[in-house]
Amino acid sequence: MIDAIYNGGLNLVAASWWTGAAWPVIWNLIKIICVVLPLLGAVAYLTLWERKLLGFMQVRFGPNRVGPFGLLQPIADALKLLTKELIQPAAAAKGLFYLGPVMAIMPALGAWAVIPFGPDLALANVNAGLLLVMAITSIEVYGVIIAGWASNSKYAFLGALRASAQMVSYEIAMGFCFLVVIMVSGSMNLTEIVAVQGRGTMTDMGLGFLSWNWLPLFPIFIVYLISVVAEVNRHPFDVVEGEAEIVAGHMVEYSGMGFAIFFLAEYASMWLVSILAVVMFLGGWLPPFDALGFIPGWIWLGIKTFLVVSMFIWIRATFPRFRYDQIMRLGWKIFIPVTLVWLLVVGAWLLSPWNIWK
């Protein structure tokens, strides 16, 4: 369908040579807009869903004043932040102070270029998609470091130091999780990783969800879920912005749209790591049962991603914040050894007669 639309548009503008030559660029811009605009809307309404779900878990109503059922609350919040003054600290490094939020939001949005929403539905279907996601998202920590240093505030700098140490530490465990998935899939292409999960005895029996990677790679699945919570600095790993000690961490000196961009980066990263979990471990757009195959794949992808994102909020409502030394110990002394052992286990499993990924 996507190819048909592209070819139709190409034929439509072919009459003018310069428009025809520019059509691939125009087409890519259209695809980028079709990904980014819904993503920004999803980020905005994720804030509302978080507040509503936390309210339900804490036996209160949550936002319910702006619009019917509070549905216009994200728009009101966006307008409020847009109209607030962007205050720059007197001793801040001006250029770097404004570069920090940009460095944080760009990787969170840029990594979506290789995320597939269906078998033939991706902005860029590249063979090294998983590697590209890892490379792009690792840049986000530089935005945090720059923001903390450029603010010329001890609280912001301390938050940036914590963030950089925590994100780098858990990136190692997360990278090993990626390696295990690459080993069993035989590819770094995200579309192929989903396709591999659609094969097997259980899929032939109509129980496709038992062929997904979450079951044979369950320890890796759990390590990945916990690692990405730490990677995006979400509760209970949010010592980076621990309200009781360093207020908002690296964002403490930001106001208005500067603060809003950091906020957008955090929630866009939540959607990103959630859809990656679905693609790598939960079958992507594949239905759990063959009987439900009539439902479009992008709907299944959306449902699964929404459930994983809701898990982030559930964790926030359930667990107390960990101490910083506990977070570092978990990453270095538990997760990295566990993932290394599982790399060896899966390697031996793939070479054994009981290889289920053939």
Swiss-Prot record:
UniProt record, GO biological process: aerobic respiration
UniProt keyword annotations, A-Z: Cell inner membrane, Cell membrane, Membrane, NAD, Quinone, Translocase, Transmembrane, Transmembrane helix, Ubiquinone
Example of a GO cellular component annotation carried by this entry: plasma membrane
Lipid bilayer topology: Multi-pass membrane protein
EC number(s) recorded for this UniProt protein: 7.1.1.-
Pfam families reported for this sequence: NADHdh
Compartments, record wording: Cell inner membrane
InterPro entries: NADH_UbQ_OxRdtase_su1/FPO (IPR001694), NADH_UbQ_OxRdtase_su1_CS (IPR018086)
GO molecular function, one term: quinone binding
Main location: membrane
Residue stretches spanning the membrane: 29-49, 95-115, 130-150, 176-196, 206-226, 258-280, 297-317, 334-354
Quaternary structure and partners: NDH-1 is composed of 14 different subunits. Subunits NuoA, H, J, K, L, M, N constitute the membrane sector of the complex.
Family membership noted in the UniProt record: Belongs to the complex I subunit 1 family.
PANTHER family: NADH DEHYDROGENASE SUBUNIT 1, NADH-UBIQUINONE OXIDOREDUCTASE CHAIN 1
Function: NDH-1 shuttles electrons from NADH, via FMN and iron-sulfur (Fe-S) centers, to quinones in the respiratory chain. The immediate electron acceptor for the enzyme in this species is believed to be ubiquinone. Couples the redox reaction to proton translocation (for every two electrons transferred, four hydrogen ions are translocated across the cytoplasmic membrane), and thus conserves the redox energy in a proton gradient. This subunit may bind ubiquinone.
Name of the protein in question: NADH-quinone oxidoreductase subunit H
Organism name: Acidovorax sp. (strain JS42)
Lineage, highest ranks first: Bacteria, Pseudomonadati, Pseudomonadota, Betaproteobacteria, Burkholderiales
Encoding gene, per UniProt annotation: nuoH
